[in-house]
UniProtKB/Swiss-Prot annotation:
Catalytically driven reaction(s): isochorismate + 2-oxoglutarate + H(+) = 5-enolpyruvoyl-6-hydroxy-2-succinyl-cyclohex-3-ene-1-carboxylate + CO2
Name used for this protein in its record: 2-succinyl-5-enolpyruvyl-6-hydroxy-3-cyclohexene-1-carboxylate synthase
Enzyme class: transferase
Gene: menD
Cofactor note: Binds 1 thiamine pyrophosphate per subunit.
Pfam families: TPP_enzyme_C, TPP_enzyme_M_2, TPP_enzyme_N
Organism annotation: Salmonella schwarzengrund (strain CVM19633)
Family label: Belongs to the TPP enzyme family. MenD subfamily.
EC number: 2.2.1.9
InterPro entries in the record: MenaQ_synth_MenD (IPR004433), MenD_middle (IPR032264), THDP-binding (IPR029061), Thiamin_PyroP_enz_TPP-bd_dom (IPR012001), TPP_enzyme_TPP-bd (IPR011766)
Length: 556
């Protein structure tokens, strides 16, 4: 009997089972213990393979692929700390709903807790963060193949959103020629190998029912808050709110077109807050709200009813309003709850939104970080997509820009970390094959610098704008101690990114004005390659401009 041959047959059943649940992308890191899984994936023609030497980046690459494809993505890593490096992406997926299937190779049980090399306690190591966990036994012909495939099917059927961790122990030897070992065991699955359906099909219904009193609430004064959603959903939500005559407060990730732009500015005006107090119902579609003023208003508003609609399970209202938590796809929910044509009830808010926009436009000529955020819609590639980093840049775009309705926007706004942003953006581009504009800060770029290796081969133009304000300037917006701010919060690195781009053979520009930036972008969009554009800006100008605009708009 060949242990290595049966390991591969066992792994082949696992990987084939994944294809029946829509898995097409498989992300693979190098490793020896994962050989059975890697070879099974490599030999399965249903998969598109992605490789990366850094497991943390690999997990985020899978996250980006899942964001766009809306299908589960598999990740294969070897044993030991390689598994631990998947933790950040796993956490993010749990908060934003992307389906990741983490196939982690492991030592067999007799090598755990006895000093064996590269052997750690992997089973259950992610605690409560995976949506589902599955610890498989060591491959053995004593367990029928139908148990293995039905167990995988059951776990995937239960996976509504987030990550599934499948821990896969394999004994040595891991290498060797294939022979007939386990062939009969494998063939007992019969014509399943030629079929395209799961062995075990389970129906699971999570969608909320139609709210029978909607006809009553849609006649009231309402407010629509739009969080993270798809481009198509964003357009539908904007039309729905317009028909109802309800003000729409759109997040940067809502893709609604933000018909009342600069919400995070005008929500700091007492007149706007007073008018919003008249709302009898607030309907929040989507989660992961960005704006500080929006979150402050959301925490203090007291409508008669506060509804939260999202396809993700769990509580999504940190203010704990009285109301309803409805689990449904946003597009489906809108169809079940049609709008009734009514006149807008807000007067002050549209006026304030227009005045706030004019204040932002008045400052657009200065070459700086805040102005880039305002101008970003002018630089979006046609028929393309935008990936927005975290920290200061996403807040500036949320507060100062107005992105087109239905234009795809992606970000990691679940745990809102700055780790893995370049890797996630790479996954977003690979899954869509669209021209992509990504914008991150300098510390975010440094954090995931080796992900530039993933950007060496792209299928469409990819532009990475690194806003270099020399440190974590988000802390300039917070009451951090002035004497400790630079060393312990901002942590300026005094670096530029030309050498990093050169190391990975990427095109590079460092424009010093808007004309040079526009020229660099024009060239970049003509070539299916990655271009790094570094904008070196005054360190505190972005935060100061935002604070100045907040003060101005609050007194309108």
């Amino acid at each position: 009997m060949s242990v290595s041959a049966f390991n591969r047959r066992w792994a082949a059943v696992i990987l084939e089972a994944l294809t029946r649940h829509g898995v097409r992308h498989v992300c693979i890191a190098p490793g020896s213990r994962s050989t059975p899984l890697t070879l099974a994936a490599a030999e399965n023609p249903a998969f598109i393979h992605h490789t990366h030497f850094d497991e943390r980046g690999l997990g985020h690459l899978a996250l980006g692929l899942a964001k766009v494809s809306q299908q589960p993505v598999a990740v294969i890593v070897t044993s030991g700390t390689a598994v631990a490096n998947l933790y950040p992406a796993l956490i993010e997926a749990g908060l934003t709903g992307e389906k990741l299937i983490l196939l982690t190779a492991d030592r067999p049980p007799e090598l755990i807790d006895c000093g064996a090399n590269q052997a750690i306690r992997q089973a259950g190591m992610f605690s409560s963060h995976p949506s589902q966990t599955l610890s498989l036994p060591r491959p053995t012909q004593d367990i029928p193949a139908r148990w293995l495939v039905s167990t995988i099917d059951n776990a995937l059927a239960m996976l509504h959103a987030g990550a599934l961790h499948i821990n896969c122990p394999f004994a040595e030897p891991l290498y060797g020629d294939m022979n007939d070992t386990g062939l009969v065991w494998q063939q007992r699955l019969g014509d399943w190998w030629q079929d395209e359906k799961p062995w075990l099909r389970e129906a699971r219904r999570l969608a909320s029912d139609k709210q029978r009193d909607w006809f009553f609430w849609r006649q009231k004064r309402g407010v629509v808050v739009a969080g993270r959603m798809s481009a198509e959903e964003g357009k539908k939500v904007a039309q729905w709110a317009q028909t109802l005559g309800w003000p729409l407060i759109g997040d940067v990730l809502s893709q609604t077109g933000q018909p009342l732009p600069c919400a995070d500015l005008w929500l700091g005006n007492a007149k706007a807050v007073t008018e919003l107090q008249q709302a009898q119902i607030v309907v929040q579609l989507g989660s992961s709200l960005t704006g500080k003023r929006l979150l402050q208003w959301q925490a203090t508003c007291e409508p008669e009813e506060y509804w939260v609609i999202d396809n993700i399970e769990g509580r999504l209202d940190p203010a704990h309003h009285r109301g309803r938590r409805l689990i449904a796809k946003i597009a489906d929910w809108l169809e079940m709850h049609p709008a009734e044509k009514r006149k807008p009830w807000c007067v002050e808010i549209p006026r304030l939104a227009e005045l706030a926009w004019q204040r932002v436009v008045a400052q657009r000529d200065t070459f700086g970080e805040a102005q880039l955020a305002h101008r970003i819609r002018d630089y979006l590639p046609e028929q393309g997509q935008l990936f927005v980093g975290n920290s200061l840049v996403v807040r500036l775009i949320d507060a100062l820009s107005q992105l087109p309705a239905g234009y795809p926007v992606y970000s990691n706004r679940g745990a809102s970390g700055i780790d893995g942003l370049l890797s996630t953006a790479a996954g977003v581009q690979r899954a869509s094959a669209k021209s992509t504009l990504a914008i991150v800060g300098d510390l975010s770029a440094l954090y995931d610098l080796n992900a530039l290796a993933l950007l060496r081969q792209v299928s469409a133009p990819f532009v990475l704008i690194v806003v270099n304000n020399n440190g974590g300037q988000i802390f300039s917006l917070l009451p951090t101690p002035q004497s400790k701010r630079e060393r312990f919060y901002l942590m300026p690195q005094n670096v530029h990114f030309d050498h990093a781009a050169a190391m990975f053979n990427l095109r590079y520009h460092r424009p010093e004005n808007w004309e040079e930036l526009e020229s660099a972008l024009a060239g970049a969009w003509r070539t299916p390659a990655t271009t790094v554009i570094e904008l070196v800006v005054n360190d505190t100008d972005g935060a100061q401009t935002l604070q100045q605009l907040l003060a101005q708009v609050s007194h309108l």
